[in-house]
C-alpha cells in the first residue's frame, strides 16, 4: 500500500519562494493522511517520448552532455518539490514536469536539490541548465533569465466544508475573519481588497496571523477564522489529504495582473525555446494534464507555454 502524507507546512515557504524573497524551508514531520497521493520514492512518473524536432533545438553545449541539469528546492512544501517518505528522493509536480520536458528533449533528467538563493545563482552561471521550482515570472528576473511558462500562479481561499461562501472579488471578503501569512504576496493583495471595500462603505476584513500553517487550519476548524488565503498548490494538497475543507475561490498571484510559473534558464543561452516547445508538446498530448491531475492542480493549467510573458512589475 502506498504511504500517505498529511503535511504540516509553513505558509510563507511557497508564497515567498514564488516571489523570490526567501529560501524554501522543509516541512515539519508528517502524519498519516487519507488522500491516496503517492509520496513514496517509487513515483511511477508520467513519461513522454522524445520529439526529434524539439530535441534538435537544444543548444549543443547542453545536448552533448546528454543531461538536462535542473535545479529545484527539494526541501519545499508539498505538492511542489519535496522529499519522499525516504527523506531523500525529491518528488512533486515540479519534478514531474521537469521529467516530461527532459523526455521530450531526449535528455536524462539530472535533478539537483538546492537552496532558493543558490538555484538562481547556479542557473545564472550555467551550472544548472534550468530551474523548475515554482518560480514566478517577474520583470526584474527577466533582466537575467529567460522563462518558458507551464503553470498559473494562483492564490486560493480555503474554508470549512460546511461554509456557504464564495470568493471571487473584494466584496466577498468584507467583514470576514481571514487568515493570511504576514509579509506574503497574498497579504498584499487582500490588504488592497480591504482598502477598496472600506472606501466603498463595506465592513473591514479582520486579518488573523499565526506562526505556521497548522495553526491556520486549527483556527479554521474551530471557527476563529472564516477563511484562509494561501498558495493554491498548498491549499489543494491540504484539501486532498484532510477532507474537512474546500477551496471556494482563487485569484491570480499577481492580483489584477496574471502571474505565471515558469522554467527558468540563463538569458540568451538558446534553451528557452526548446523548453517552451517541450512543454507545449506534453500539453498537447495530454501528459501535462495527467501530471497536474495527479497533484490536484488542474486549475493551474495553462493553455499554451509562452516565452518571457509580462511578469510581475518591479517593486
Predicted feature residues:
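Acidic, polar ligand-binding/catalytic clefts
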Residues: 108-172
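Extended ligand-binding regions for polar small-molecule ligands
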Residues: 20, 30-53, 95, 103-104, ...
